[in-house]
Amino acid sequence: MKKKVGIVFGGKSAEHEVSLQSAKNIVDAIDSDKYDVYLLGIDKQGNWHVNDRSHYLINEEDPKLISLNKTNEGIAVIPGAEKNQIVTSNSTKSLDQLDVIFPIVHGTLGEDGSLQGMLRMANIPFVGSSVLGSAISMDKDIAKRLLKDAGLKVAKGYAYRSVDKESIHFDSLKEELGLPMFIKPANQGSSVGVHKVENEEQFYSAIKDAFQFDHKLLVEEAIVGREIECAVLGNEKPAASVPGEILPTGDFYSYEAKYIDETGAVLQIPAKLEEPVVDSIQDIALQAFKALNCEGLARVDVFLTDDNEIVINEINTLPGFTKISMYPKLWEESGVSYRELIENLIELAIERNQRDQQLKSSRSDG
């Protein structure tokens, strides 16, 4: 019998369009002989739409113009139910019982534990990290504190909240971190709101922009090194892919280079590295995955310095699945096809849910 898979995509996030592209690639690649697909799109206002596979995206081939087809059919979620947890809000009829949800909502509310918490309350298995792993990985400040505590190297930097913005001074940070510096929102992905600054004017402009995306930001030293990414797959016994290298054609790997401009970067897969360095990167990726309580999947981004020091940049618990995204490409190079990768992720989600169901929820045995 086919499994029923709900794909949740879009979202009230600066990474909305990236999510639409990721969803399209997953829908195109999923094995229709094994899975029935249900499409649940979230628009930029946060409204949910039950979509049909034949027409769920508008301008789907253009990453600049791609958008969600808004339907008149929303949904409501019933927490605590054992079945029929999702009903259509207009007709109050339940959707077919979903076996698993594949959330591919990048960024705010989709990758930060919010969506994961709702799905846990509804007792629906879902792909990717649960609430804790998602939340702490999304917050770059908290993630780096935990990674550092686990003995892993991260860039030197400082976190500031918007209420403290008057205490952010260029001269003192320049003396502490040097130039250039990077300024980034603490809770954004895909390089949204990230700035490389070389002078005071750029610095304060970047601070202002970053605070438009989050109430907390990081000011970090620039690490001189190669940009390497490693994909991780699994639950309690995760595996790491071959590493790949990002070769940006611009100043750094920006949002445009990642998702809009196909010439914005060259992806070298596998990265040209000595075997001991590959082993070290894979080991550090797995350590980071475990330190942040990740499950299912993650992409670990690191810098490799000239003296082969590995510095973790960030960990992404719902990496992009667009046609130019590194995560699926790394697994393809490692011998796992795009279709097999989707199947593995679905099975990992179901496996974790079954494991969680074995836990006691009360002190009585009954």
From Swiss-Prot:
Top EC group: ligase
S-S bonds: none
Cofactor, free-text remark: Binds 2 magnesium or manganese ions per subunit.
Residues binding Mg(2+) 1: D301, E314
Catalytic activity entry: 2 D-alanine + ATP = D-alanyl-D-alanine + ADP + phosphate + H(+)
InterPro entries noted in UniProt: ATP-grasp (IPR011761), ATP_grasp_subdomain_1 (IPR013815), D-Ala_lig_Van_CS (IPR000291), D_ala_D_ala (IPR005905), Dala_Dala_lig_C (IPR011095), Dala_Dala_lig_N (IPR011127), PreATP-grasp_dom_sf (IPR016185)
Binding site for Mg(2+) 2: E314, N316
Pathway info: Cell wall biogenesis; peptidoglycan biosynthesis
A family per Pfam: Dala_Dala_lig_N
GO process annotations (BP): cell wall organization; peptidoglycan biosynthetic process; regulation of cell shape
Cofactor(s) this protein requires: Mg(2+); Mn(2+)
Family: Belongs to the D-alanine--D-alanine ligase family.
Protein function: Cell wall formation.
Protein name according to UniProt: D-alanine--D-alanine ligase
Name of the encoding gene: ddl
